[in-house]
Each structure stands twice: as C-alpha cells, then as structure tokens.
C-alpha cells in the first residue's frame, strides 16, 4: 500500500514539475562546480537539475520526510548536489557563495520544518546521504561516522564489531547522523550516558571558505558550537568522531499500557515523581496517545510506558516494585535482549525481526507537525486532564512523549556543550501528530497550537524552552534571505538559553557574512546581543 501511495505521489509531483514556473538560470553555478571539483572525483553525476525531471524528482523526494513542505516545483531550487566526495561539498560551498546562492544541507531529511530542503530565495540542496562511511575501532572504543550515515547503519556497524559497545543516540533508525548529533540528539541511554554531543571528540567540517577543518584547525570555540548548536549555522558537517560506551550484553525492556479507565492519569502523575529519580540504568518513557475505546466509536487516552534497563529482569523488578508499584509491572511483561535488539523493540518491530531492517532507508512521505517543551514541576492531575481533553480533538494519529531526565543529564553542566537543557528538568515533552489527507492540515495545525497553549501553564517559562532537533517554526523565525538578530534571539534563547551569546560570538568569527543561514539559524551580530541578564 505504501509503495502504491508513493508511486502516486511521484506521478503528481512530476505533473506539477513539468508545468512549473521556469527556475532561475543555474548555468553559472553548474559550470563553477565542474571547475572547482577534483578531477579524481568528477562531480557531473552528483548534480541533479530540473532538466532531468525523473532523477531530479527522485533525488528530491527520497529524503523529504515532511510532505507538508515538499515542493520540487519551487522556482528557487536551482539544483541538488548529492555529494559523493568531500571535494563535492567544498565545490558546492565555494560556488554557491560566489554566485549568491543559499545552501540547504540535508543528511537524513528529518528536519521537522523542512528547512533542509525549502527556501524562498535561490538555493541548492547539498544532500549528504551518500557520505555514509562508518569505521569502528573496538580497541579504543571510538568510531568515525559520516554525516549521511543513518543511526540504524551506525548501530548495526557497532554491533558487528562488539556486543558490549553502544552509542547513546535516538530511536529512529532513519535519522541522519549529521543533523541528529549536531543538535544534541538523545535516546533511551541518555540518563546513563547523556546526549550524542557529550561523546563527540572530533569532527570534520567544511567552512565558509570551502576549507576542510577538524577539531584542531577549527578551534575549540567552533568545536563547542557544533556540539548542540546545530552544524548548519557554521558550515557543513562531514563526519564525527565519537566515543562509544560500554554496555552489558543483556538489557531488559517492557511496554505496559494504562488507559484513563484503568487509572492512567494517576499513574502518569506518580511517574512524574519518580522517573527522574530512578537509577541511571533505567529509562522509563510515558507516551500518552489517542486510541479507540471499548465501545464502538468511543475514543480515549492510553498511556504507554516504555522502559529500557541496562541489566536483568530480577533487578528491574525490584526497582519497580519498590519505587513504582502503581504501574503493576509483571515479570511476564519483561523481555531480555541485546542492545541492538532493543533498537528493534523501540521501533515497535516484532521479536525476531532481522537487524538488516535497520539498514533500510524507506520513503514514507506523510504530513506531520511536532513541538517540544521542558517540564520543571509535576503537572497536576487537572492539567493532565486538560491535555487529554485537547488531544481527543484530533481525528488522526497524535501522541506525546514524556522523556525523563535525571541521572547523567543532571551532572553535565549546561555550558559544557552548546546543548543547554540539563539539570532542573523533570522531563522533556515531544508533541507529534501525523496525517495523510492534505485537506486536514489546517485543522491539525490549529489543534496542535491549542494543545501547546493548554500545556503552557505547566511547562518552563521565561523562556518557554524548546529542543532544537524538534525544529518548530512557531516559536520564532526569520525570512529565508535575512537574519534579524532581534527575531533570532526569540527562538535562539528558547533553544540555547544562556549559550546563545557564545554561539553568536562563534558565528561572528567563523561566518561573519552569514552565508550559512536559514529561518532559524544563529546570527553573527554579537554587538547587538544584550547581556545574559537582559536576554
């Protein structure tokens, strides 16, 4: 069914593309690419333009995850460069800059607001998905991973080398390493080990002048900025060198559901009191979602409690019985498995699914909207009930992720990297809704806005914090071709808190003319930033 829908999607896009408004002349840019690229690595086959409708369209759609922003007919899109070598990246930067063309950098295509493949000014997409090499050194417990590799590919590569090493990153196997790591990616190991950026020890980046830099040549300030501040404001991330972490051979996982009729609200309230205080080895996510009720046509809220424990069932049961008996966990709810198999469990794949599924790069275009929040104090039961009531207004898939903090997240200083959301948070919230009918877009965005407003009294304030990797244009943005510092401070302080000033300082030194920009990039205008106590 998905394949049929995707085929129809391509046909409709091709029809629109053939009738599109003529795009600006990209000839000078293309000629520059051919001149700048290394003769040993010809770039011609890496360039896709509208002149070849089929290949251009396939390249565009394959890594465009949010249909809400999919627009290959955009007259400003001059070309897609699918880099196969570092020289292709360098040539794209040099030629785009010299021709006054904006670059949008796309690794996995998971940018929630489409900023890696959409612009209202002339631009090119620099697609990194073919730069996906991964090397694992078990003896040093380190790995190099290129920006275009997916988390699934990284996890499989680590598992092939060792069953007692892992990397603390996200649960979505198709996310690209370039953007995920640079924004402070997290997963179910974060209470034990922190976020992705806490384990980056080197990086390769192409700067605004087309130079290839590493940690030594870029300097510690820029290296600090790209770990949590997002790489796309500072250059093009080519690869990361990461520390791997030691894990046991056996993990325990479970999934337990509680509907409202089963006392779900009371259980979630208690979860808020204990989830951030569990031993670091335990990550227990609460996932409220809309489900069908027991009666025909009835809908209710079910809270799915997903857990991962670095250890055996016996120890986990002891912790749960002592600290969270309200959940009613039974031994038969638990499954023991390897770290790699936990990634399949979190992907909701059945037991026995081959690990090769993590290597897939499926294209399932859907409409979706996501937002984020940070919670400092337990949400009262009446607040939870207001949230449930608003969720039930959706007529499509909607869920929240309550991701517990505590553990290592409390022990890493907020300025150790550019990712600032550390001690003081009980949990992070992700709001998510998805749909297939384009006619439902306006209604779903409206309800999502209402849900966000309903939650406002119960989350962080001054500022209302947000997670950069859950990009949300609603919290502030600039036009594609401009970066006003006052507007940038609105979204920048929500994403980066007290680290914003240093990020803008780094930007002023590394990209003073603001070549690398998008609607939510970091501006280089340090002189106009107020003091920290004024932000």
Curated annotation (Swiss-Prot):
Pfam families linked: BBE, FAD_binding_4
Compartment(s): Endoplasmic reticulum; Cell membrane; Secreted, Cell wall
Keywords: Cell membrane, Cell wall, Disulfide bond, Endoplasmic reticulum, FAD, Flavoprotein, Glycoprotein, Membrane, Nucleotide-binding, Oxidoreductase, Secreted, Signal
GO biological process entries: cellular response to hypoxia
Induction conditions: Up-regulated by MKK4.
Cofactor, how bound (note): Binds 1 FAD per subunit in a bicovalent manner.
Cofactor(s) this protein cannot do without: FAD
Documented EC number(s): 1.1.1.-, 1.-.-.-
Entry comment on modification after translation: The FAD cofactor is bound via a bicovalent 6-S-cysteinyl, 8alpha-N1-histidyl FAD linkage.
Protein name, as recorded: Berberine bridge enzyme-like 3
Organism annotation: Arabidopsis thaliana (Mouse-ear cress)
